[in-house]
């Protein structure tokens, strides 16, 4: 492709270092031009959160393929009103999973349902000391929060389930 340099031409790719560089030399085949209907900021917000969400969703889909006929159905998404979480809810819903979204924002329940969450749970149900053993509820989990919320999601994941961890905004414990 023919790439120009200058204001308004912002290109992105998530494979190489140098995202904060003012100038970087990279192979032109690795570049994607920012769509004209998005600002540079919007493009990067979607690019970073969207890429992370997509990788987490693909991990769940790949696990399903390994189960040889066992269907991954119930998927939990923590931090569901954040960038990665909300995009994960949308992607997983489009993939056909029953998504349960976890949020601490009660005023966002309608929003989460509008983007594909079948159920919405308050994070208070997860932000507590986990039991050593709990009932298996989830075939898959996308966790963007970490800490006690992740610990509870782990003990509630069914045997042969998959957990994709891509954040620790709550705690690194």
Please tell me what each predicted stretch does.
Residues 6, 27, 115-116, 159:
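Short, structured coil segments at secondary-structure junctions
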Residues 148-173:
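Glycine-rich phosphate-binding loop and adjacent beta-alpha segment
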Residues 1-11:
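Single conserved hydrophobic/aromatic residue that forms the stacking wall/gate
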Residues 85-94:
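Surface-exposed amphipathic alpha-helices with a cationic face
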Residues 50-51, 79-86, 146:
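Glycine-rich NAD(P) Rossmann-fold beta1-alpha1 loop
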Residues 77, 93-152:
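Adenosine-nucleotide cofactor-binding segment
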Residues 9-79:
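NAD(P)H dinucleotide-binding glycine-rich loop of Rossmann-like/cofactor-binding domains
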